[in-house]
Amino acid sequence: ATYKVKLVTPDGPVEFDCPDDVYILDQAEEEGHELPYSCRAGSCSSCAGKVSAGTVDQSDGNFLDDDQIADGFVLTCVAYPQSDVTIETHKEEALTG
């Protein structure tokens, strides 16, 4: 399946289609959008965003705890879309601050 991903960035919103077997960060880059990242392995907070609508599968990541995930935080480098999804990007400071 392919879902619509909307990223709400500091520069404004961007939208693109993302297959459910491609990480959102990877697809965003493929579409020409630059997002923050560091490890690309789900073990840091550089790429953190916050899901405001929809669902993702980020079971490949291990940095976020259950409370952070429950609050909507997502690591875009290990997140597969599970529905049409809206994510606010550049949330590392909100997560770690």
UniProtKB/Swiss-Prot annotation:
One of its GO terms (molecular function) is electron transfer activity. GO terms for cellular component: chloroplast; chloroplast stroma. GO terms for biological process: electron transport chain; ferredoxin metabolic process. CDD domains: fer2. It is found in: Plastid, Chloroplast. PANTHER family: FERREDOXIN, FERREDOXIN-2, CHLOROPLASTIC. Belongs to the 2Fe2S plant-type ferredoxin family. Its cofactor is [2Fe-2S] cluster. [2Fe-2S] cluster binds at residues 39, 44, 47, 77. Pfam families: Fer2. It comes from Lycium chinense. Keywords: 2Fe-2S, Chloroplast, Electron transport, Iron, Iron-sulfur, Metal-binding, Plastid, Transport. Binds 1 [2Fe-2S] cluster. Ferredoxins are iron-sulfur proteins that transfer electrons in a wide variety of metabolic reactions. The keyword Electron transport applies. This is Ferredoxin. The keyword Ubl conjugation does not apply. Residues 3-93 form the 2Fe-2S ferredoxin-type domain.
